[in-house]
Amino acid sequence: MEWWTAFQAFILGVVEGLTEFLPISSTGHQIIVADLIGFGGERAKAFNIIIQLAAILAVVWEFRGKIFQVVRDLPSQRQAQRFTANLLIAFFPAVVLGVLFADLIHEWLFNPITVALALVVGGVVMLWAERRKHVIRAEHVDDMTWKDALKIGCAQCLAMIPGTSRSGATIIGGLLFGLSRKAATEFSFFLAMPTMVGAAVYSGYVYRDLFRPEDLPVFAVGFVTSFVFAMLAVRALLKFIGNHSYAAFAWYRIAFGLLILATWQFHLIDWSTAGEV
């Protein structure tokens, strides 16, 4: 493995780990950064699956206590049964739309301009949602109803547009639907588990011929890096939301999106092949 390839894997692992669970769009950042450092082609498709799995495993590890409790109580406890049902209900809309439109979305929307516009629009919506007066109905994830879960699941479908952010769509959706900031964030993390695992399994099957033994060192670098930085990002976000709003992420989205649009408009960067991964 050449040093430059290892460096590319490290950078993209960092990007995936830091952005997957922050409301700033990991897919959008991956498209932009991968193009800037020249990481593309068939290997990139398999690599992205690996680093996404690493990120979700980091969340599983962070919430292992809650997961164990739910699994233990599922046969007999109503609360655990309702929580599991809510996750499945929220997961369902993304499954349906993903199966029907994933290839079409990847073909038509995976480009820097879509990413930039989605970043800006999402940032504006995030600012509006934060400044809007909220009536909190569900302080904790266990207080959610199936209707809350379904609405958040529908909001998650917006994240199929690159640049929108899965966590951003579900967290802001949760806030608008009456969840506390803590409940919306935690449910977003839990919903990421079946959603991302399902997407990774589906993509892994579709691109199964792209996994080659000679790429294992590259995958290992990306996997470890993504896992470590995702764990750090999750811990930092959970601590951050205790005393802060999501406004800082909103302004970052807007600034980053406008920067991408400016580089495209004034031909400062050639984005012609971005997204071809």
Curated annotation (Swiss-Prot):
Transmembrane segments: 47-67, 85-105, 108-128, 187-207, 218-238, 249-269
E.C. number: 3.6.1.27
Recorded topology in the membrane: Multi-pass membrane protein
Pfam families tied to this protein: BacA (PF02673)
Domain of life from the UniProt record: Bacteria
Compartment annotation: Cell inner membrane
GO molecular function annotation: undecaprenyl-diphosphatase activity
Chief location of this protein within or outside the cell: membrane
GO cellular component: plasma membrane
Any single GO BP term: peptidoglycan biosynthetic process
Function, in words: Catalyzes the dephosphorylation of undecaprenyl diphosphate (UPP). Confers resistance to bacitracin.
Other observations noted: Bacitracin is thought to be involved in the inhibition of peptidoglycan synthesis by sequestering undecaprenyl diphosphate, thereby reducing the pool of lipid carrier available.
NCBIfam families assigned to the protein according to its UniProt record, in alphabetical order: PRK00281.1-2, PRK00281.1-4, undec_PP_bacA
Assigned protein family: Belongs to the UppP family.
Name of the protein: Undecaprenyl-diphosphatase
Gene behind the chain: uppP
